[in-house]
Each structure stands twice: as C-alpha cells, then as structure tokens.
Amino acid sequence: MTDTKRKPIWKNELVWLFLITSGLFTLLYSKFLLGGFAYVFTDCGADTLQINYAQYEMFSSLFRSGDSGYALQAGLGMDLSSYCPAYLIPYNLLLILAPQRLLPWAVLASAYLKLLTMSLVGYLFYRKLMGEGIGTMAAALAWTFSGYVILWGQQYGFCTCMALFTVFMYFLQCYLNGEKRWKNAGLVLTVTMLLFASYYFLYMIAFFAVFYVVIYSIMQKRSIKSAAGKMIGLGGMGILGTLIGGIALVPIADTFLESARAGAVSGGSTSGLFHPYKGKTLGTIFARFFSNQMLGIDKEYSGNLNYYEGIVLAVSILTVFAISYFLVKKATRIKAIFLTALMVFLVVMPFTSRVLVFTKNSHRWCFMICFVEALAIGLFLQDVFREKNKKTVLCGGALATIIYAAMMVFVYSFK
C-alpha cells in the first residue's frame, strides 16, 4: 500500500494511532496538563530549568523586541546569531513565537508534537518494512514511548533529536526503496535540521545510517554494486545537508574543539575498549533492559554512572519474546542469531560508546537499540498471528520465559 491510498477514516491506522498517542500523552503528562506544574525539572533533570527554559525565555524576548541578537547580559557581550538556526526547527520555532506568559504551555505543546511525529512518522517507516497491521502500530507506539524517549526526552533537545531521527529514517527508507525523488530533499533538509539541533546526534545517526544501509542490503540480498551506490548517494545527501546548514558549522566546530569531548577523542585511554563490561555496569545493562526505574530514580539510583547516563534499553518485555520467537522459527533463525549477537556486542563493549559518544562513560547512543527493539516487536506481532505452526509459538514463548527468568535472577543477584 502506498502512503497516499485513502481508507475510511474509522479504518485508517494513522487516525487510530493519533488518538492512542494523544490519549497516552494526556495520561502520562497529566501532571503538567492538569496539575498546575510546568514541564521543567529541579532534580537531576535541572538543565531544563537552569539552561533550556532560560534560553527559550531569552530568545523569545530577543525575537519580540527585534534586537540584533547581541546579548549584553553575557559577560562583556555575546553574539547569539549562531544559535538562531536551531530555532528554525519547527518544534523550537513554536517556543519563540509563543508569548512569554504562555511559554510553559508552548514547551508542553512542543513535546506533544515531537511524540506525535515519532508515532505517526515512525508508523510510516515501520509500515514500509512490514505493511499495515497491529505490529506496525505496536512498533510505532513502542518506539514513541520507549524508555529512552520518555527519560532522555525530558531534556527538550534530546526529544527534538529523536523526532528528527524518526523523520530521517523514514526518508532514508524511501531513498532505499527508490521512491519519488522529492523525498530525497526531505532527507537532505532533515540532515540540516539535525545539524542545527545537535552535531553529535547527527554524528551518531550517520553511523547508524551506514549500518542500516549495509544490513538492509544484506537482508534484501542486494548486490554490492547496488549497496555501494546507495551508500555513495546517502553520503552525498549528507554532505549537501551539512553544507546547507553551513551557517552553523563554524560555531559548532568551535564549540566542539573547546569541549571536553574533543580531548576525549585524542587523549582518552584505549585500554579495555574491547573487553566486555563487567560487574555493576553489566548489571545495569540487564536491569535497564526491563525498566528505567529498576535501579531507582535520581539520588536513589544504584546503577552505573547516573540515572540519565546509565544505559537505557527498556522498550517492552515483548522484546524478549520477539527475539526468542525468531530464534526458534527456522526461516528466521540465522538472521535472528546474527542481529541479536550484533546488538549484544554493541551494548556490552565499551568501544561502542567511545566511538559514538567519545567516552565509554556515556550511553546516549542507545536510542538506536531501542529503535531496533521496536522494529523486532512489530515484526513479531505481525508474524505471530499469521503463524500456522503453533509449536513455534509455544517453543518461542518457553524460551522467552527461560531467558527472562535468567536475566531477572542476574539482576536481583546484582542488586
């Protein structure tokens, strides 16, 4: 089915997804919608109040006053023009257009639009891989309300990057499918917006895109020539998108070179990068696969690093059932073994964090794993209801139960 094919509104999965997403947002964010609280935090998420919200107020004031963008409040003065491109992103543009007295509501509306983007555009992406059905809707919802999005999404910029990442993946899949060329322009512009939003998220997403193109080409049994052609085209569009955002390149480069990350790239030790995590770090990985809260919240958090920086892998317990099902099913066993082994390797090796985040003491890249988990859940639900061999379903369920029990025993022995 194409994206433009019309269906009766009560049968349109996008309409139902819109309603479900809106309902879940209302439920999860009712404290801010109905309880008289602003969507800012004063605990370990205090950056939202001390940095983000303050910046939004300042840029909203500058926009409304018509000032040049040179702030005298910062030391001897500071040119803020290099920050302006970030407010061309629709989610951020809303924040400076809203009157300052309505800024708390604008922040909440922006969060809603980001989650809605992840849900609806995520659905369009997953539909290209598995068609319509309950699995596609489940995958979109699993991604939108995954542990990473809900936790790190409290940091407004992270949620913006997750929404743009979802849009990027949709246009990337359109490109790989050879669809209309205007969609390539969407891919280019999304790269530009990602550059404005966060240079290191763009960097991480570029790595994921390369992996995705390679693995997708292998799964689709495409020729090396075809895969290489797609990779070159993707690289060209990435460069074009970066050049379009050229106004932000110089300040971004300056910010990076002056940051701690630049020193980490060249000065960090490489010892132990290919030795799997052990002890507390490994226990945290297992625990946070089930829930962000399993090791406590904020100051009560007992895992590795801190509540935010500790790895976040929680999507749904259905991930275990999906993996087990595809491992048991003969037609998918080899692919499942390969992909599961690859994901586990990336998660347990410090090398991954060092390459993607420039330090082994951060796991901000794990949104990629959550995105793949949501895909696995969708494929599982899409396939399991069509599976005629009930023995496969039962064996998959039994294996999942064993794996789940073993992981829980390990987690509680660690705690």
Named regions from a protein language model:
Residues 21, 112, 116-128, 134-219, ...:
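Membrane-embedded helix bundles of polyisoprenyl
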Residues 109-117, 159-167, 206, 311-318, ...:
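Membrane-embedded alpha-helical segments of multi-pass membrane proteins
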Residues 22-118, 141-163, 256-263, 269-311, ...:
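Membrane-interface coil-to-helix junctions
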Residues 1-32, 229-233:
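Start-transfer (signal-anchor) and selected internal transmembrane alpha helices
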Residues 13-28, 189, 237-241, 282, ...:
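Alpha-helical transmembrane segments
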Residues 182-183, 201, 334-415:
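Contiguous transmembrane helix-bundle modules in multi-pass membrane proteins
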Residues 12-16, 99-106, 110, 131-139, ...:
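Membrane-interface starts of transmembrane alpha-helices
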